[in-house]
């Protein structure tokens, strides 16, 4: 499946570039009502930006992923940075039982950038805000 192909790519890049510290897996979420109508999730501080969500994999499904809490700490640090200027940009962090290939580094994040109901412009604006917050978090050593 898609995650097996993604895993092969991650392994290849980590082997070729062993200094890689962070792996970002970017998605658009599918949030819809019972009739299949897609929800459009927007940041309250910037109506032109979609909301974001971190999905953190764990070892809850039985597969080895002992350091998953390191990824959770990173997600929380980035979310805290973003919260200062954009309190409604981030949806709550979700921890799931699957690994989502996050066992490959302790700097792995799955980022849901808006939903299928958001426009491309809203997703790009949110991604720019995320990138600035991610960089600021790293610069501050959090």
Residue map of PLM features:
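A short, glycine/acidic-enriched catalytic loop
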Residues: 31-64
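Second-shell loop/turn segments in exported
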Residues: 1-4, 10-13, 60-69, 112-121
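Loop/turn elements at helix/coil->beta-strand transitions in domains of secreted/extracellular proteins
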Residues: 17-22, 50-51, 88-89, 106-107
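Extracytoplasmic/secreted envelope proteins and their assembly/folding machinery
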Residues: 4-11, 72-79, 108, 124-131
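Solvent-exposed loop/turn segments at secondary-structure junctions
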Residues: 28-33, 59-62, 98-101, 115-118
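Active-site-adjacent substrate-binding region
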Residues: 67-94
């Amino acid at each position: 499946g898609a995650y097996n192909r993604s895993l092969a790519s991650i392994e290849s890049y980590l082997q070729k570039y062993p200094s890689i510290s962070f792996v970002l897996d970017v998605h658009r979420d599918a949030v819809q009502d019972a009739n299949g109508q897609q929800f459009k999730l927007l940041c309250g501080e910037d109506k032109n930006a979609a909301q974001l969500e971190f999905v953190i994999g764990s070892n809850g499904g039985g597969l080895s992923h002992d350091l998953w809490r390191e990824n959770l700490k990173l997600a929380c640090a980035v979310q805290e940075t973003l919260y200062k200027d954009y309190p409604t940009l981030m949806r709550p962090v979700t921890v799931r039982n699957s690994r989502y290939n996050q066992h490959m580094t302790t700097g792995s994040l799955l980022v849901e950038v808006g939903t299928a109901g958001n426009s491309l412009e809203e997703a790009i604006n949110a991604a720019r805000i995320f990138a600035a917050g991610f960089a600021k978090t790293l610069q501050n050593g959090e």
